[in-house]
């Protein structure tokens, strides 16, 4: 595997493009508007600059990594790559449409991966004629720092596809751990109910955010409290994942907190909107 395309130049997409280029892959980062890819490239350049400043990589290596990244607003530029990693918003119809298009554009042996954090890989694969070569590659945010890639096998994902993607993730310096397709996979099936429970304790007046987060940080050795983490992830994303769990597992223990729904409706999404459980 020599070349990778990343669909989406946002926070996750540009992070994936960066770590792939730093690992020696030739990368094409694709989005629907030139301004989006320009913003993504600017983010990568800033990130590489910080790594050089911290002496975690040389200027020569940073320049080489940047040179391996090209950009495009045409998905047909993915036609010759070995692996595509999709990193667009968590909307099944959008992902299915992109995978259907990529299935027609990409060479038959190309692997199509999704960075989805909760959407069924098997459902995404149904939009293609290569379900054995469709897989989940759930990178964690921020991608250049976090060491895990959660690999999700769909119902028809082949062992060869899994092995190839695990090897690619490891080449990027990540630990790749695999699971089978299920709502929320492992990471968010366990994490998001905890975040939701923290929101419920706030909703019920049990404690204020500083106390809730402080108890989990100091008492449970969490590096960040659940409410601050919810703000970092985005409250709209947390709500989406809770809805996926609630509907997919058909269990009311996954019902999202009313406070979470209210805050999302009010546009209080966390860091990205400037206000969530904290102000930024």
Q: Which role does the model predict for each range below?
A:
Residues 111-180, 188-189:
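Rossmann-fold dinucleotide-binding core
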Residues 1-50, 54:
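NAD(P)+-binding Rossmann beta1-loop-alpha1 motif at the extreme N-terminus of oxidoreductases
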Residues 7, 30, 72, 87, ...:
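Structural motif
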Residues 21, 29, 65-83, 167-173, ...:
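Amphipathic alpha-helical segments at domain termini/boundaries
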Residues 13-15, 95, 117-121:
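Short glycine/serine/threonine-rich phosphate/pyrophosphate-binding segments
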Residues 36, 50-111, 119:
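Rossmann-like NAD(P)-binding element
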Residues 25, 79, 142-152, 223-224, ...:
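Acidic/polar active-site rim loop that often engages polyanionic ligands
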Residues 2, 23-25, 159, 163, ...:
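NAD(P)-dependent Rossmann-like dehydrogenase/reductase catalytic/cofactor-binding core
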């Amino acid at each position: 595997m020599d070349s990778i395309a990343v669909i989406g130049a946002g926070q996750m997409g540009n992070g994936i493009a960066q770590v792939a280029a730093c690992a020696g892959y030739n990368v094409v980062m694709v989005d629907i508007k030139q301004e989006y890819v320009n913003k993504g490239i600017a983010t990568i350049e800033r990130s590489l600059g910080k790594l050089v400043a911290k002496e975690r990589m040389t200027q020569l290596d940073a320049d080489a990594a940047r040179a391996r990244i090209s950009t495009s607003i045409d998905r047909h530029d993915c036609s010759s790559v070995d692996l595509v990693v999709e990193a667009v918003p968590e909307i099944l119809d959008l992902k299915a449409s992109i995978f259907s298009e990529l299935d027609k554009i990409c060479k038959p042996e190309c692997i199509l991966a999704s960075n989805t954090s909760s959407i069924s890989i098997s459902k995404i694969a149904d939009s293609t004629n290569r379900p054995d070569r469709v897989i989940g590659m759930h990178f964690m945010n921020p991608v250049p720092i976090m060491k895990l890639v959660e690999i999700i096998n769909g119902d028809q994902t082949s062992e060869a596809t899994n092995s190839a993607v695990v090897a690619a993730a490891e080449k990027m310096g990540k630990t790749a751990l695999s699971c089978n397709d299920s709502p929320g996979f492992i990471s968010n099936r366990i994490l998001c109910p905890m975040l939701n429970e923290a929101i419920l304790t706030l909703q019920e007046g049990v404690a204020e955010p500083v106390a809730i987060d402080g108890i989990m940080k100091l008492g449970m050795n969490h590096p960040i409290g659940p409410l601050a983490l919810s703000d970092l992830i985005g409250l709209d994303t947390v709500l989406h994942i809770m809805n996926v769990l609630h509907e997919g597992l058909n269990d009311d223990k996954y019902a999202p907190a009313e406070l979470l729904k209210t805050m999302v409706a009010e546009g209080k999404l966390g860091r990205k909107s400037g206000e969530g459980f904290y102000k930024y």
